[in-house]
C-alpha cells in the first residue's frame, strides 16, 4: 500500500484524505494495456472520458474509493488531477501595437494552422469568398458547427488568418489565406482541462501531414507549475 501511494500526485492525495469531493476528474498514466485499465474503471462505475495514446494517459472520472483500488493495479504508473489551464489575456490596446510590414507578403496559401482555443465564430474574414475553417471539433459541448462563446478563439484566428474584407483591409491577419483547424478545448470562461488540450494536440499532430499543418497555436497558460503535467506535453 505504501508503494502505491507514491503513484499519487500530492494535491490529489490531500483531497482524497480530506474527502471533500465526491467525484474526481483524473489523469491516469499507464504502462501498458489501456483497454484493461479502462475496463476496470468501468467496473468501478467510473467514466472513461478519453485516451491519449501518445503520452499513455487515460482521462477518467472516478470516486475516491475507486481511485484507491486502481492504485493497486501494476499497470497504473501515476495518477493526478486533470487540472485547468486558462487562456492568455488579450486586449485591444495590446493587439493594436502589432504592426506587420506589407513588404513581407505573407499569405499562407496552401498552408494550415491548428488552433486550440475557445472556438471560432464563422466571421466573414474567415469564410468569404470561401470558408477557410476546415476543421472544428468541440470538446466542451459537442456541437457540430463552429462557434465561440468566449471570443478569444475568434480573435486569435482573426490575427492569424483574417483577410480583412469586413474592414476594407484595415484589419488583416498575418497570413490571410491559411486554412484553420480549430479544436474548442476551452469553455466560455476561458478554462480548459489538460486532457482536452493534450487530446487536441495529439489529433492536430496526427492530421498535420494530411492537411499541411505547419503551425499549432497554443494561446494558454498554467496558473501553477506541475512537473508531471509539463512532461506530458514534452512527450508529444
Where is each model-derived feature located?
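Short glycine-/aliphatic-rich beta-strand segments at the starts of folded cytosolic domains
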Residues: 15-30
Amino acid at each position: 500500500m505504501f508503494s502505491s501511494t507514491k503513484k499519487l500526485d500530492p494535491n490529489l492525495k490531500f483531497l482524497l484524505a480530506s474527502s471533500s469531493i465526491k467525484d474526481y476528474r483524473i489523469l491516469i498514466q499507464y504502462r501498458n494495456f489501456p483497454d484493461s485499465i479502462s475496463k476496470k474503471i468501468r467496473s468501478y462505475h467510473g467514466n472513461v472520458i478519453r485516451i491519449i495514446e501518445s503520452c499513455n494517459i487515460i482521462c477518467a472520472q472516478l470516486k475516491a474509493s475507486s481511485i484507491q483500488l486502481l492504485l493497486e493495479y501494476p499497470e497504473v504508473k501515476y495518477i493526478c488531477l486533470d487540472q485547468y489551464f486558462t487562456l492568455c489575456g488579450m486586449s485591444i490596446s495590446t493587439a493594436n501595437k502589432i504592426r506587420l510590414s506589407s513588404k513581407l507578403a505573407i499569405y499562407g496559401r496552401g498552408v494550415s494552422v491548428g488552433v486550440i482555443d475557445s472556438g471560432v465564430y464563422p466571421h466573414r474574414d474567415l469564410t468569404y469568398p470561401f470558408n477557410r475553417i476546415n476543421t472544428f471539433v468541440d470538446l466542451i459541448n459537442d456541437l457540430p458547427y463552429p462557434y465561440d462563446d468566449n471570443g478569444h478563439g475568434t480573435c486569435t484566428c482573426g490575427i492569424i488568418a483574417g483577410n480583412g474584407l469586413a474592414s476594407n483591409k484595415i484589419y488583416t491577419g498575418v497570413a490571410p489565406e491559411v486554412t484553420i483547424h480549430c479544436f474548442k478545448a476551452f469553455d466560455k470562461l476561458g478554462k480548459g482541462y489538460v486532457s482536452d488540450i493534450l487530446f487536441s494536440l495529439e489529433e492536430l499532430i496526427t492530421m498535420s501531414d494530411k492537411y499541411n499543418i505547419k503551425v499549432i497555436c497554443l494561446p494558454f497558460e498554467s496558473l501553477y507549475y506541475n512537473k508531471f503535467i509539463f512532461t506530458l506535453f514534452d512527450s508529444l
